[in-house]
Amino acid sequence: MATTATPQLLGGSVPQQWQTCLLVLLPVLLVSYYLLTSRSRNRSRSGKLGGAPRLPPGPAQLPILGNLHLLGPLPHKNLRELARRYGPVMQLRLGTVPTVVVSSAEAAREVLKVHDVDCCSRPASPGPKRLSYDLKNVGFAPYGEYWREMRKLFALELLSMRRVKAACYAREQEMDRLVADLDRAAASKASIVLNDHVFALTDGIIGTVAFGNIYASKQFAHKERFQHVLDDAMDMMASFSAEDFFPNAAGRLADRLSGFLARRERIFNELDVFFEKVIDQHMDPARPVPDNGGDLVDVLINLCKEHDGTLRFTRDHVKAIVLDTFIGAIDTSSVTILWAMSELMRKPQVLRKAQAEVRAAVGDDKPRVNSEDAAKIPYLKMVVKETLRLHPPATLLVPRETMRDTTICGYDVPANTRVFVNAWAIGRDPASWPAPDEFNPDRFVGSDVDYYGSHFELIPFGAGRRICPGLTMGETNVTFTLANLLYCYDWALPGAMKPEDVSMEETGALTFHRKTPLVVVPTKYKNRRAA
């Protein structure tokens, strides 16, 4: 769904290991801070059009840290509280990095549409830069000719109808496995941790799309190790990097002293060894000719051999795009499915309404929902919309960076300013949504509001040039999975647990997920035919 989320960012206050580094580097950081603020004051005196700029309001800043201390473990919530005081366009300084946070639909429209071309580059964060093989993916590549070529390739090759059909096959195959597992659990009347089943499903879908049917077989000997390294990569990208907020020699030294650089290199090297093996296996002349044009790696290898445009495609491009696909798709789809099921377990009347729609549309005496049934379930799609409104997987959209001086809602924003869009705050803004904290899919009855980038009060996938390229595939995975969970089973909470007891506490960094597992009891739908 949403491509790679906010990198190395706001996942918490400054960790303990950095306190020693900051003390050791205090003199260097003080000098850097003085030089930076001196340059900022000089630029401010010159201003746009020869006058003083009208900068957005914001909280007072500490020396060195700027406003880093205000973020906390749930930055989207803290930033919403700050926006209530300072307004929907707010200026911060994160370390030495000038930053603007927008927290309303109108401000988001200015960033993502009106001034999209001014605000559509990406900051060169060191962690994502390394793991993307020097920004060779789509999610973190800076705006320019390279990014346009890559986006075109995505549209023509990776998101073509042939690829969509391959993804459909992967979904059907993995859903059969999930239903078989849940049938066994239902037969034993046991409670299950739904998280485990949902993550296995989404991992299987994306793995099959990327590497082919072998990913789900015992022949794929590297799967478990790859999953561990992938988890490490996602955790590392969400960790605090001093260089991300102090992009100078002092920040690099702090990362080196803390062990962050060594950890990043270890993860990168493990991923690289794995991807080299996968590419070599796909290029083996003895390998059978794949069906349906092959998997994602096959398509990318063919681009290496055949692409004659301005972009020279290499093995590093293959690795960067495959990693981008895994990081951007598995976690985001999984957390959306789990938040939807959590909300439905808290609202039994909504669960029954969605279930009745799915079962009426699909009919009785079927083993499960098929992909073509998705067009018949409009209310379930409202459930997905409402879930994404309340729980966007990336609460802060992937950061943008201004390419030139621009304005946002009348405020001057200099070039090279980092821009965050607080999608979580926008989805809960009472100016756009009555009873904004209530889960109520019926609010979309008769409404044309969607999440495809035209309605800025609902932007879990972003909008404009940088809208998530995998939106359609992610949306399909989520809707298809929820439809099957609701059709195939009745759901209950374990023991004497009541709907209001379902915890909605969240935690995370790259994506924000449930703090505790979702434990439920499935019962097989009595009118469903066995597979």
From Swiss-Prot:
Keywords: Endoplasmic reticulum, Heme, Iron, Membrane, Metal-binding, Monooxygenase, Oxidoreductase, Transmembrane, Transmembrane helix. It is found in: Endoplasmic reticulum membrane. Its main location: endoplasmic reticulum. It catalyses: (E)-4-hydroxyphenylacetaldehyde oxime + reduced [NADPH--hemoprotein reductase] + O2 = (S)-4-hydroxymandelonitrile + oxidized [NADPH--hemoprotein reductase] + 2 H2O + H(+); (E)-4-hydroxyphenylacetaldehyde oxime = (Z)-(4-hydroxyphenyl)acetaldehyde oxime; (Z)-(4-hydroxyphenyl)acetaldehyde oxime = 4-hydroxyphenylacetonitrile + H2O; 4-hydroxyphenylacetonitrile + reduced [NADPH--hemoprotein reductase] + O2 = (S)-4-hydroxymandelonitrile + oxidized [NADPH--hemoprotein reductase] + H2O + H(+). PROSITE patterns: CYTOCHROME_P450 (PS00086). It is an enzyme of class 1 (oxidoreductase). The keyword Endoplasmic reticulum applies. Signal peptide: none annotated. It is a single-pass membrane protein. It holds the Pfam family p450. GO terms for cellular component: endoplasmic reticulum membrane. Heme b binds at residues 122, 151, 466, 468. Its cofactor is heme b. InterPro entries: Cyt_P450, Cyt_P450_CS, Cyt_P450_E_grp-I, Cyt_P450_sf, Cytochrome_P450_71. Its EC number is 1.14.14.37. The keyword Repressor does not apply. GO terms for biological process: dhurrin biosynthetic process. Belongs to the cytochrome P450 family. Cytochrome P450 involved in the biosynthesis of the cyanogenic glucoside dhurrin. Catalyzes the conversion of p-hydroxyphenylacetaldoxime to p-hydroxymandelonitrile via three different and successive activities: isomerization of the (E) isomer to the (Z) isomer of p-hydroxyphenylacetaldoxime, followed by dehydration of the oxime to the corresponding nitrile, and C-hydroxylation of the nitrile to produce p-hydroxymandelonitrile. This is 4-hydroxyphenylacetaldehyde oxime monooxygenase. It comes from Sorghum bicolor (Sorghum).
